UniProtKB/Swiss-Prot annotation:
GO terms for biological process: cellular detoxification of fluoride; fluoride transmembrane transport. Fluoride-specific ion channel. Important for reducing fluoride concentration in the cell, thus reducing its toxicity. Keywords: Cell membrane, Ion channel, Ion transport, Membrane, Metal-binding, Sodium, Transmembrane, Transmembrane helix, Transport. It comes from Listeria monocytogenes serovar 1/2a (strain ATCC BAA-679 / EGD-e). This is Fluoride-specific ion channel FluC 2.
Length: 129
């Protein structure tokens, strides 16, 4: 069952990444890859914490979403290739900006994802009834 969930969610994540490339692709800067990786950092931190704590989501579904959808949506390999291509084309400023935005931005997005999940989880604890 795990393979089915990971496969289905992986297909959806790959299609969403492809759509982002169509929407944001082109130009000298790999903005589509940066966007999917930053969004993926936020989603993984938020969804895995929130779904694991709040709802009765099965481990199979969590793996499908985390490993399948977010794993296929994000791409470290494209980040690496994009960085090397920027360096080889002499676009050092773009390359350094891309690496810094990816790593620092990724950490910030994880922090925001966890903060939002914590806020929503704590809000539910304060309700009466």
């Amino acid at each position: 069952m795990y393979f089915l969930y990971v496969g289905v969610f992986g297909a959806l994540g790959g299609m969403c990444r492809y759509a982002m490339n169509l929407w944001l692709g082109g130009g000298d800067f790999p903005s589509a890859t940066l966007a999917v990786n930053l969004i993926g950092c936020f989603l993984l931190a938020f969804l895995m914490r929130f779904l694991a704590e709040k709802s009765r989501v099965s481990l199979v579904l969590l793996n499908g979403i985390g490993t399948g959808f977010i794993g296929a949506f994000t791409t470290f390999s494209a980040f690496s290739v994009d960085t090397i291509q920027l360096v080889q084309s002499g676009a050092w400023l773009f390359a350094v900006s891309y690496v810094l935005a990816s790593f620092i931005g990724g950490l910030i997005m994880v922090k925001f994802g966890r903060m939002l999940s914590n806020k929503l989880l704590n809000r539910g604890e304060h309700r009466v009834g």
